Amino acid sequence: MEMPNLGDMMKQIQQAGAKMQDVQKQLEKTVTHGEAGGGMVKVSVNGRQRLLSLAIDPDIMDDREMVQDLVLAAVNSAIEESGRVSQEEIAKVAGGMINPADILKNMGK
């Protein structure tokens, strides 16, 4: 059985690291959207799961509890979509070497 070439392995690791940095930069620019209440609350989140925008229909501002519930629902929807997109992009680069969920846990640190 032939021993793996350590130099080749290090080169592959460096290439994967560079690709991951590119993916993280791309994810900062990737925007997903969520909405609730038939569009009364709309949010945008980037691929690093940072809230970018929040729009609330002024007609619902009198009902504080409803606004709070709709904001939570819209934000959670956008974050879920962002997480799905992020995992897909990371999986493309990782090629089975690493678990995308592990990377996502550490992205905000």
Curated annotation (Swiss-Prot):
UniProt KW DNA-binding keyword: yes
The keyword Lipid metabolism appears for this protein: no
Cellular-component GO terms for this entry: bacterial nucleoid; cytosol
Coiled coil: none
Sorted UniProt keywords: Cytoplasm, DNA-binding
Pfam families in UniProt: YbaB_DNA_bd
An annotated Gene Ontology molecular function: DNA binding
Places the protein is found: Cytoplasm, Nucleoid
Chief location: cytoplasm
Role according to the record: Binds to DNA and alters its conformation. May be involved in regulation of gene expression, nucleoid organization and DNA protection.
Family the UniProt entry places it in: Belongs to the YbaB/EbfC family.
Subunit text: Homodimer.
Record protein name field: Nucleoid-associated protein Cvib_1034
Species of provenance: Chlorobium phaeovibrioides (strain DSM 265 / 1930)
